[in-house]
Amino acid sequence: MDDNKKRALAAALGQIERQFGKGAVMRMGDHERQAIPAISTGSLGLDIALGIGGLPKGRIVEIYGPESSGKTTLTLSVIAEAQKNGATCAFVDAEHALDPEYAGKLGVNVDDLLVSQPDTGEQALEITDMLVRSNAVDVIIVDSVAALVPKAEIEGEMGDMHVGLQARLMSQALRKITGNIKNANCLVIFINQIRMKIGVMFGSPETTTGGNALKFYASVRLDIRRTGAVKEGDEVVGSETRVKIVKNKVSPPFRQAEFQILYGKGIYRNGEIIDLGVSQGLVEKSGAWYAYQGNKIGQGKANAAKYLAENPAIGAEIEKQIRDKLLTSGAVAAAGKAAAVEADADDMADADAGY
């Protein structure tokens, strides 16, 4: 840059700082770049697939999927993990369906959880914005976008047409709160539901509620699906769950994670540690036996996971090694390519099957 341009730029920067305050424009090289802070999801595999060890703070996240796929369970798991590190969490229950007993079983400290059950969509989003602007709340869950009913719709008759009201409400609210979320370094998670588009001949007919604004403003979008049942004998005790990262602004997207959600217990984390430990060569598997550092820890995955539950220090040690090994840029990039290929293959299979 020549001297005239340098002087002109310095004058412009000086004028901007006087008018808008120091820090209105910054040179990236003047400040040390820091990793984006993250909050664990409670699933080790999903934390690794996200690339930064969890969901990013200071960003908007959307989690969507069919009914009974584990959306609320996953968000309650995020709250439980955040509370372990002293975070303040809030749950905006627009569906009026939060079960405190179930939340407690998943590890949520219900006594410290802030809960709001608003009457209208405007009230829910205004409460969310006020909590964000307080700079005192670390995680806010909005459950769900589909239940954010505009005031005009609630006050109207049952058969009245209100075209695009909810989409306009979401668009206006997200414009307003995005900057506040970044300044407060708060994680805001919107749970969303799936609807079917009528008359779609090619491609997926599925869409999410609330218009397109949330798709643009969300830094991470997670598609969660139930893929099967977990059984003990003939009794169904949980769900096989797959999460696809449809959008990711903080790491390469299109990865996926698979884990089990056990009814009344939440994400089967010790089972994930065993599986990932074996795949990374940290846990030895010989026949049905699992061993760690030469010591047998159980016959069968269930017994090995039970051993880790009884010896949390060993489980934490294995988990730390897995995170150190996989949450490096090279390992994450390699894992991302493999998962993207696998996800593409799954999408093609789904399309062939007519899903």
From Swiss-Prot:
The keyword DNA-binding applies. CDD domains: RecA (cd00983). ATP binds at residues 65-72. Keywords: ATP-binding, Cytoplasm, DNA damage, DNA recombination, DNA repair, DNA-binding, Nucleotide-binding, SOS response. SUPFAM superfamilies: P-loop containing nucleoside triphosphate hydrolases, RecA protein, C-terminal domain. It comes from the Bacteria. GO terms for molecular function: ATP binding; ATP hydrolysis activity; ATP-dependent DNA damage sensor activity; damaged DNA binding; single-stranded DNA binding. The keyword DNA repair applies. This is Protein RecA.
